[in-house]
Protein backbone atom coordinates (compact mmCIF):
# COMPACT_ATOMS: atom_id res chain seq x y z
CA UNK A 1 0.00 0.00 0.00
CA UNK A 2 1.60 3.27 -1.15
CA UNK A 3 2.15 5.94 1.50
CA UNK A 4 0.52 9.35 1.24
CA UNK A 5 2.58 12.53 0.94
CA UNK A 6 1.61 13.52 4.48
CA UNK A 7 2.75 10.12 5.78
CA UNK A 8 6.09 10.49 4.00
CA UNK A 9 6.59 13.93 5.57
CA UNK A 10 5.81 12.49 8.98
CA UNK A 11 8.38 9.76 8.35
CA UNK A 12 11.05 12.39 7.65
CA UNK A 13 10.16 14.16 10.90
CA UNK A 14 10.54 10.87 12.77
CA UNK A 15 14.03 10.36 11.36
CA UNK A 16 15.11 13.83 12.49
CA UNK A 17 13.62 13.23 15.93
CA UNK A 18 15.41 9.90 16.18
CA UNK A 19 18.74 11.57 15.48
CA UNK A 20 17.97 14.27 18.03
CA UNK A 21 17.11 11.69 20.72
CA UNK A 22 20.33 9.80 20.10
CA UNK A 23 22.42 12.99 20.31
CA UNK A 24 20.68 14.03 23.51
CA UNK A 25 20.92 10.66 25.31
CA UNK A 26 24.12 9.25 23.86
CA UNK A 27 22.23 6.02 23.20
CA UNK A 28 20.59 4.55 20.13
CA UNK A 29 16.81 4.44 20.09
CA UNK A 30 17.13 0.65 19.91
CA UNK A 31 19.00 0.71 23.23
CA UNK A 32 16.40 3.00 24.78
CA UNK A 33 13.64 0.72 23.50
CA UNK A 34 15.23 -2.35 25.05
CA UNK A 35 15.85 -0.58 28.37
CA UNK A 36 12.15 0.21 28.63
CA UNK A 37 11.11 -3.22 27.39
CA UNK A 38 13.39 -4.87 29.97
CA UNK A 39 11.82 -2.76 32.71
CA UNK A 40 8.34 -3.83 31.61
CA UNK A 41 9.44 -7.45 31.21
CA UNK A 42 10.86 -7.58 34.74
CA UNK A 43 7.60 -6.25 36.15
CA UNK A 44 5.52 -8.76 34.19
CA UNK A 45 7.58 -11.83 35.06
CA UNK A 46 7.47 -11.15 38.83
CA UNK A 47 10.92 -12.68 39.28
CA UNK A 48 12.83 -9.58 40.34
CA UNK A 49 12.00 -5.88 40.65
CA UNK A 50 13.01 -3.69 37.70
CA UNK A 51 15.19 -0.63 38.26
CA UNK A 52 11.99 1.37 38.77
CA UNK A 53 8.23 1.03 38.36
CA UNK A 54 7.28 1.18 34.65
CA UNK A 55 4.98 4.06 33.76
CA UNK A 56 2.39 4.78 31.10
CA UNK A 57 0.30 7.90 30.78
CA UNK A 58 -2.77 9.11 28.92
CA UNK A 59 -3.22 12.88 29.02
CA UNK A 60 -6.03 14.42 27.03
CA UNK A 61 -4.67 15.24 23.56
CA UNK A 62 -6.56 18.51 23.36
CA UNK A 63 -5.51 19.60 26.84
CA UNK A 64 -1.84 18.82 26.19
CA UNK A 65 -1.38 19.61 22.50
CA UNK A 66 -4.44 21.57 21.44
CA UNK A 67 -5.35 18.83 18.94
CA UNK A 68 -8.99 17.77 19.43
CA UNK A 69 -10.04 14.15 19.81
CA UNK A 70 -11.80 14.41 16.46
CA UNK A 71 -8.39 14.38 14.76
CA UNK A 72 -8.25 10.66 15.49
CA UNK A 73 -11.16 10.30 13.04
CA UNK A 74 -10.63 13.09 10.50
CA UNK A 75 -7.00 14.29 10.67
CA UNK A 76 -4.75 11.28 11.26
CA UNK A 77 -1.43 13.08 10.81
CA UNK A 78 -2.37 15.75 13.36
CA UNK A 79 -3.46 12.98 15.73
CA UNK A 80 -0.20 11.07 15.23
CA UNK A 81 1.83 14.21 15.85
CA UNK A 82 -0.12 14.84 19.06
CA UNK A 83 0.49 11.30 20.36
CA UNK A 84 4.16 11.57 19.40
CA UNK A 85 4.52 14.90 21.20
CA UNK A 86 2.97 13.45 24.35
CA UNK A 87 5.28 10.42 24.18
CA UNK A 88 8.48 12.41 23.61
CA UNK A 89 7.66 15.00 26.27
CA UNK A 90 6.54 12.63 29.03
CA UNK A 91 8.75 9.60 28.17
CA UNK A 92 6.51 6.72 29.29
CA UNK A 93 7.90 3.19 29.35
CA UNK A 94 4.93 2.04 27.26
CA UNK A 95 3.54 4.31 24.56
CA UNK A 96 -0.07 4.64 23.50
CA UNK A 97 -0.64 5.36 19.81
CA UNK A 98 -4.41 5.57 20.28
CA UNK A 99 -7.14 3.85 18.29
CA UNK A 100 -7.73 6.12 15.30
CA UNK A 101 -10.26 5.21 12.61
CA UNK A 102 -11.95 6.94 9.70
CA UNK A 103 -14.92 9.05 10.73
CA UNK A 104 -15.90 9.34 7.06
CA UNK A 105 -16.22 5.55 6.86
CA UNK A 106 -18.20 5.34 10.09
CA UNK A 107 -20.61 8.01 8.85
CA UNK A 108 -20.99 6.40 5.41
CA UNK A 109 -21.91 3.08 7.00
CA UNK A 110 -24.25 4.80 9.49
CA UNK A 111 -22.81 2.89 12.45
CA UNK A 112 -25.39 2.46 15.20
CA UNK A 113 -23.30 1.34 18.19
CA UNK A 114 -20.74 4.16 18.31
CA UNK A 115 -20.71 7.92 18.67
CA UNK A 116 -17.45 9.64 17.83
CA UNK A 117 -15.93 13.12 18.16
CA UNK A 118 -16.24 15.28 15.07
CA UNK A 119 -19.21 13.17 13.92
CA UNK A 120 -22.27 12.77 16.17
CA UNK A 121 -20.26 14.24 19.10
CA UNK A 122 -18.42 17.57 19.55
CA UNK A 123 -14.70 17.53 18.59
CA UNK A 124 -13.40 17.41 22.18
CA UNK A 125 -15.57 14.48 23.37
CA UNK A 126 -14.43 10.88 23.82
CA UNK A 127 -15.85 8.10 21.66
CA UNK A 128 -18.93 6.45 23.17
CA UNK A 129 -20.39 2.98 22.68
CA UNK A 130 -24.15 2.69 22.32
CA UNK A 131 -25.56 -0.64 23.40
CA UNK A 132 -28.55 -2.17 21.72
CA UNK A 133 -30.38 -5.46 21.34
CA UNK A 134 -28.72 -6.42 18.06
CA UNK A 135 -29.83 -10.04 18.49
CA UNK A 136 -33.31 -10.83 19.82
CA UNK A 137 -33.87 -13.31 22.60
CA UNK A 138 -35.59 -15.78 20.26
CA UNK A 139 -32.76 -15.68 17.69
CA UNK A 140 -30.17 -17.80 19.50
CA UNK A 141 -30.92 -20.82 17.32
CA UNK A 142 -30.48 -18.75 14.15
CA UNK A 143 -27.14 -17.52 15.42
CA UNK A 144 -25.95 -20.92 16.63
CA UNK A 145 -27.01 -22.87 13.54
CA UNK A 146 -25.48 -20.49 10.98
CA UNK A 147 -23.56 -17.54 12.46
CA UNK A 148 -22.39 -16.27 9.05
CA UNK A 149 -25.96 -16.07 7.76
CA UNK A 150 -27.08 -14.39 10.96
CA UNK A 151 -24.33 -11.76 10.75
CA UNK A 152 -25.10 -10.89 7.13
CA UNK A 153 -28.93 -10.91 7.21
CA UNK A 154 -29.65 -9.82 10.78
CA UNK A 155 -26.64 -8.27 12.53
CA UNK A 156 -25.17 -6.03 9.83
CA UNK A 157 -28.55 -4.53 8.81
CA UNK A 158 -29.20 -3.60 12.44
CA UNK A 159 -25.68 -2.42 13.25
CA UNK A 160 -25.11 -0.41 10.06
CA UNK A 161 -27.90 1.70 8.61
CA UNK A 162 -26.26 1.62 5.19
CA UNK A 163 -26.56 -2.17 5.11
CA UNK A 164 -30.26 -2.39 5.94
CA UNK A 165 -31.10 -3.93 2.52
CA UNK A 166 -29.20 -7.09 3.46
CA UNK A 167 -32.16 -8.04 5.66
CA UNK A 168 -34.10 -8.81 2.45
CA UNK A 169 -31.69 -11.52 1.30
CA UNK A 170 -32.84 -15.15 1.42
CA UNK A 171 -30.94 -17.53 3.72
CA UNK A 172 -27.37 -17.55 2.42
CA UNK A 173 -26.79 -21.16 3.41
CA UNK A 174 -29.31 -22.25 0.77
CA UNK A 175 -27.63 -20.48 -2.15
CA UNK A 176 -25.61 -23.43 -3.44
CA UNK A 177 -26.92 -22.65 -6.90
CA UNK A 178 -29.21 -20.16 -8.52
CA UNK A 179 -27.40 -17.04 -7.35
CA UNK A 180 -28.58 -15.41 -10.57
CA UNK A 181 -32.09 -15.55 -9.14
CA UNK A 182 -31.36 -12.83 -6.60
CA UNK A 183 -29.47 -10.53 -8.99
CA UNK A 184 -32.59 -8.40 -9.70
CA UNK A 185 -32.74 -7.66 -5.98
CA UNK A 186 -29.04 -6.79 -5.94
CA UNK A 187 -29.58 -4.46 -8.90
CA UNK A 188 -32.41 -2.57 -7.18
CA UNK A 189 -31.86 1.11 -6.22
CA UNK A 190 -31.53 0.37 -2.50
CA UNK A 191 -28.82 -2.27 -3.04
CA UNK A 192 -26.99 -0.01 -5.49
CA UNK A 193 -27.11 2.78 -2.89
CA UNK A 194 -25.76 0.35 -0.28
CA UNK A 195 -22.91 -0.66 -2.60
CA UNK A 196 -21.99 2.97 -3.17
CA UNK A 197 -21.91 3.66 0.56
CA UNK A 198 -19.76 0.58 1.19
CA UNK A 199 -17.41 1.72 -1.59
CA UNK A 200 -17.23 5.18 -0.02
CA UNK A 201 -16.39 3.66 3.35
CA UNK A 202 -13.79 1.40 1.74
CA UNK A 203 -12.05 4.27 -0.05
CA UNK A 204 -12.07 6.39 3.11
CA UNK A 205 -10.66 3.55 5.20
CA UNK A 206 -7.93 2.80 2.67
CA UNK A 207 -6.92 6.48 2.51
CA UNK A 208 -6.96 6.72 6.31
CA UNK A 209 -4.80 3.61 6.70
CA UNK A 210 -2.29 4.85 4.15
CA UNK A 211 -1.97 8.07 6.09
CA UNK A 212 -1.97 6.69 9.63
CA UNK A 213 0.49 3.86 8.87
CA UNK A 214 1.78 1.88 11.84
CA UNK A 215 1.79 4.48 14.61
CA UNK A 216 2.96 2.04 17.29
CA UNK A 217 5.94 0.96 15.20
CA UNK A 218 6.87 4.58 14.53
CA UNK A 219 6.92 5.29 18.27
CA UNK A 220 8.94 2.11 18.80
CA UNK A 221 11.51 3.42 16.31
CA UNK A 222 11.92 6.40 18.65
CA UNK A 223 12.58 4.07 21.59
CA UNK A 224 9.12 3.52 23.09
CA UNK A 225 7.52 0.03 23.34
CA UNK A 226 3.79 -0.32 22.75
CA UNK A 227 1.44 -0.66 25.69
CA UNK A 228 -0.45 -3.44 23.90
CA UNK A 229 0.39 -5.01 20.56
CA UNK A 230 -2.80 -4.34 18.64
CA UNK A 231 -3.49 -6.55 15.67
CA UNK A 232 -0.72 -8.95 16.64
CA UNK A 233 -3.07 -11.87 17.28
CA UNK A 234 -4.47 -13.42 20.43
CA UNK A 235 -8.01 -14.48 21.30
CA UNK A 236 -9.74 -11.43 22.75
CA UNK A 237 -11.56 -11.21 26.06
CA UNK A 238 -14.49 -12.94 27.71
CA UNK A 239 -17.03 -14.35 25.22
CA UNK A 240 -19.81 -13.32 27.62
CA UNK A 241 -18.85 -9.68 26.98
CA UNK A 242 -19.24 -10.23 23.24
CA UNK A 243 -22.76 -11.57 23.70
CA UNK A 244 -23.67 -8.90 26.24
CA UNK A 245 -22.30 -5.82 24.49
CA UNK A 246 -22.45 -6.70 20.80
CA UNK A 247 -25.42 -9.06 20.49
CA UNK A 248 -27.99 -9.12 23.28
CA UNK A 249 -27.22 -5.89 25.12
CA UNK A 250 -26.77 -5.67 28.88
CA UNK A 251 -30.44 -6.14 29.73
CA UNK A 252 -30.85 -9.03 27.31
CA UNK A 253 -27.81 -10.92 28.56
CA UNK A 254 -28.83 -10.45 32.19
CA UNK A 255 -32.30 -11.85 31.42
CA UNK A 256 -30.75 -14.73 29.46
CA UNK A 257 -28.80 -15.90 32.53
CA UNK A 258 -32.20 -16.78 34.01
CA UNK A 259 -34.41 -17.60 31.03
CA UNK A 260 -31.99 -19.04 28.46
CA UNK A 261 -28.85 -20.07 30.36
CA UNK A 262 -27.97 -23.00 28.11
CA UNK A 263 -28.39 -20.99 24.90
CA UNK A 264 -26.25 -18.23 26.39
CA UNK A 265 -23.51 -20.70 27.30
CA UNK A 266 -23.68 -22.31 23.85
CA UNK A 267 -23.23 -18.90 22.22
CA UNK A 268 -20.26 -18.11 24.47
CA UNK A 269 -18.67 -21.47 23.68
CA UNK A 270 -19.15 -21.08 19.93
CA UNK A 271 -17.71 -17.56 19.88
CA UNK A 272 -14.64 -18.69 21.81
CA UNK A 273 -14.13 -21.83 19.72
CA UNK A 274 -14.24 -19.82 16.49
CA UNK A 275 -11.83 -17.24 17.86
CA UNK A 276 -9.36 -19.90 18.94
CA UNK A 277 -9.64 -21.66 15.57
CA UNK A 278 -8.73 -18.48 13.69
CA UNK A 279 -6.19 -17.04 16.15
CA UNK A 280 -2.70 -16.12 14.99
CA UNK A 281 0.34 -17.04 17.12
CA UNK A 282 2.77 -14.35 18.23
CA UNK A 283 5.30 -13.57 15.51
CA UNK A 284 8.82 -13.76 17.02
CA UNK A 285 10.13 -11.52 14.23
CA UNK A 286 7.95 -8.61 15.34
CA UNK A 287 8.57 -6.25 18.23
CA UNK A 288 7.45 -7.04 21.72
CA UNK A 289 9.22 -9.21 24.26
CA UNK A 290 6.85 -10.29 25.55
CA UNK A 291 4.01 -9.35 23.22
CA UNK A 292 0.99 -8.08 25.12
CA UNK A 293 -2.54 -8.88 23.98
CA UNK A 294 -5.15 -6.52 25.41
CA UNK A 295 -8.54 -7.78 26.63
CA UNK A 296 -11.16 -5.20 27.72
CA UNK A 297 -13.51 -6.73 30.30
CA UNK A 298 -16.60 -5.31 31.97
CA UNK A 299 -19.58 -7.57 32.65
CA UNK A 300 -17.79 -9.73 35.23
CA UNK A 301 -18.08 -6.84 37.66
CA UNK A 302 -19.75 -7.49 41.03
CA UNK A 303 -22.56 -5.06 40.20
CA UNK A 304 -23.50 -7.00 37.06
CA UNK A 305 -23.46 -10.59 38.29
CA UNK A 306 -23.20 -12.65 41.45
CA UNK A 307 -20.22 -14.84 42.29
CA UNK A 308 -22.24 -17.90 41.27
CA UNK A 309 -23.07 -16.34 37.90
CA UNK A 310 -19.46 -15.26 37.45
CA UNK A 311 -18.29 -18.83 38.02
CA UNK A 312 -20.83 -20.22 35.55
CA UNK A 313 -21.10 -17.68 32.74
CA UNK A 314 -18.00 -15.50 32.83
CA UNK A 315 -14.87 -17.05 34.25
CA UNK A 316 -14.76 -20.34 32.29
CA UNK A 317 -14.74 -18.53 28.94
CA UNK A 318 -12.34 -15.83 30.12
CA UNK A 319 -9.92 -18.39 31.55
CA UNK A 320 -9.92 -20.38 28.31
CA UNK A 321 -9.39 -17.19 26.30
CA UNK A 322 -6.44 -16.10 28.45
CA UNK A 323 -4.86 -19.55 28.49
CA UNK A 324 -5.21 -19.83 24.71
CA UNK A 325 -3.65 -16.38 24.33
CA UNK A 326 -0.74 -17.46 26.52
CA UNK A 327 -0.35 -20.68 24.53
CA UNK A 328 -0.05 -18.56 21.37
CA UNK A 329 2.99 -16.81 22.83
CA UNK A 330 1.39 -13.68 24.27
CA UNK A 331 1.08 -12.20 27.72
CA UNK A 332 -2.64 -11.81 28.39
CA UNK A 333 -3.46 -8.21 29.32
CA UNK A 334 -7.03 -8.12 30.70
CA UNK A 335 -8.41 -4.66 31.44
CA UNK A 336 -10.75 -5.09 34.39
CA UNK A 337 -12.88 -2.04 33.66
CA UNK A 338 -14.98 -2.20 36.80
CA UNK A 339 -15.03 -3.61 40.34
CA UNK A 340 -13.92 -7.23 40.08
CA UNK A 341 -12.63 -7.28 43.67
CA UNK A 342 -11.59 -10.66 45.06
CA UNK A 343 -12.56 -12.31 41.78
CA UNK A 344 -9.00 -11.46 40.77
CA UNK A 345 -8.01 -14.52 42.82
CA UNK A 346 -9.00 -16.64 39.83
CA UNK A 347 -5.95 -15.29 37.97
CA UNK A 348 -3.84 -17.51 40.24
CA UNK A 349 -5.16 -20.45 38.18
CA UNK A 350 -3.10 -19.19 35.22
CA UNK A 351 0.69 -19.45 34.78
CA UNK A 352 2.91 -17.11 36.77
CA UNK A 353 4.27 -14.11 34.90
CA UNK A 354 1.98 -14.57 31.90
CA UNK A 355 -0.81 -12.12 32.78
CA UNK A 356 -0.98 -8.37 33.43
CA UNK A 357 -4.06 -7.42 35.45
CA UNK A 358 -5.13 -3.88 34.59
CA UNK A 359 -7.27 -2.41 37.38
CA UNK A 360 -8.85 0.95 38.12
CA UNK A 361 -11.77 0.58 40.52
CA UNK A 362 -10.34 -2.40 42.41
CA UNK A 363 -8.56 -1.77 45.73
CA UNK A 364 -4.94 -1.87 44.55
CA UNK A 365 -3.58 -2.81 47.97
CA UNK A 366 -5.93 -5.79 48.20
CA UNK A 367 -5.16 -6.75 44.60
CA UNK A 368 -1.43 -6.71 45.31
CA UNK A 369 -1.94 -8.91 48.37
CA UNK A 370 -3.86 -11.41 46.23
CA UNK A 371 -1.55 -11.49 43.22
CA UNK A 372 1.92 -10.57 44.52
CA UNK A 373 4.70 -12.73 43.18
CA UNK A 374 2.38 -14.28 40.59
CA UNK A 375 0.61 -11.71 38.42
CA UNK A 376 1.73 -8.20 37.52
CA UNK A 377 -0.65 -5.35 38.33
CA UNK A 378 -1.18 -2.46 35.94
CA UNK A 379 -2.81 0.16 38.15
CA UNK A 380 -4.69 2.99 36.45
CA UNK A 381 -5.08 6.21 38.38
CA UNK A 382 -8.83 6.97 38.77
CA UNK A 383 -10.63 8.80 35.98
CA UNK A 384 -11.56 11.49 38.50
CA UNK A 385 -7.90 12.57 38.50
CA UNK A 386 -8.68 14.48 35.30
CA UNK A 387 -10.07 17.22 37.55
CA UNK A 388 -7.47 16.92 40.32
CA UNK A 389 -4.56 19.28 40.85
CA UNK A 390 -1.01 18.20 40.04
CA UNK A 391 -0.30 17.97 43.77
CA UNK A 392 -3.27 15.67 44.32
CA UNK A 393 -2.19 13.33 41.50
CA UNK A 394 1.38 13.28 42.80
CA UNK A 395 0.32 12.58 46.39
CA UNK A 396 -2.11 9.82 45.35
CA UNK A 397 0.45 8.12 43.11
CA UNK A 398 3.29 8.25 45.62
CA UNK A 399 1.01 6.88 48.33
CA UNK A 400 0.10 4.05 45.95
CA UNK A 401 3.80 3.33 45.38
CA UNK A 402 4.41 3.25 49.14
CA UNK A 403 1.60 0.74 49.67
CA UNK A 404 1.95 -1.47 46.58
CA UNK A 405 5.34 -0.88 45.02
CA UNK A 406 7.52 -3.16 47.12
CA UNK A 407 8.93 -6.24 45.45
CA UNK A 408 8.05 -5.29 41.87
CA UNK A 409 5.20 -6.80 39.90
CA UNK A 410 3.47 -3.47 39.37
CA UNK A 411 3.14 -0.84 36.64
CA UNK A 412 1.33 2.49 36.82
CA UNK A 413 -0.84 4.32 34.32
CA UNK A 414 -0.65 7.95 35.44
CA UNK A 415 -3.78 9.75 34.30
CA UNK A 416 -2.99 13.47 34.21
CA UNK A 417 -5.23 16.48 34.95
CA UNK A 418 -6.92 18.13 32.00
CA UNK A 419 -5.64 21.55 32.99
CA UNK A 420 -2.02 22.53 33.35
CA UNK A 421 1.14 23.56 31.55
CA UNK A 422 3.45 21.22 29.66
CA UNK A 423 6.15 22.03 32.18
CA UNK A 424 3.80 21.00 34.97
CA UNK A 425 2.98 17.68 33.27
CA UNK A 426 6.65 16.92 32.71
CA UNK A 427 7.63 17.85 36.26
CA UNK A 428 4.91 15.59 37.66
CA UNK A 429 5.97 12.61 35.53
CA UNK A 430 9.63 13.10 36.43
CA UNK A 431 8.77 13.25 40.13
CA UNK A 432 6.74 10.02 39.99
CA UNK A 433 9.40 8.35 37.85
CA UNK A 434 12.13 9.06 40.41
CA UNK A 435 9.95 8.13 43.38
CA UNK A 436 9.29 4.73 41.82
CA UNK A 437 12.96 3.67 41.77
CA UNK A 438 13.86 0.51 43.68
Per-segment meaning from a language model:
Residues 1-438:
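Catalytic cores of TIM-barrel enzymes
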Amino acid sequence: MAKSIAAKEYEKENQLLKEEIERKTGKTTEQLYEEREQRVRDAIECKKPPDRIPLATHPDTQAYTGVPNSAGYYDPIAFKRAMRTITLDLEPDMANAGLPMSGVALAALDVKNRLWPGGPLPPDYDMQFVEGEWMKGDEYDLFLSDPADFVVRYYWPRMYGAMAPLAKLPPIGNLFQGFEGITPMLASPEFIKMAKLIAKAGRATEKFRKTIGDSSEELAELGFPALSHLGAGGIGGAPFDVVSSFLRGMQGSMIDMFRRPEKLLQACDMILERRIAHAIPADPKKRGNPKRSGMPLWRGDKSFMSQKQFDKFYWPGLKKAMQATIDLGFVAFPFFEAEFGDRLERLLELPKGKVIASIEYVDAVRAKDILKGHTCLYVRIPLSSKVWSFNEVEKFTKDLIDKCGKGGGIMLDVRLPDRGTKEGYQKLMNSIREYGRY
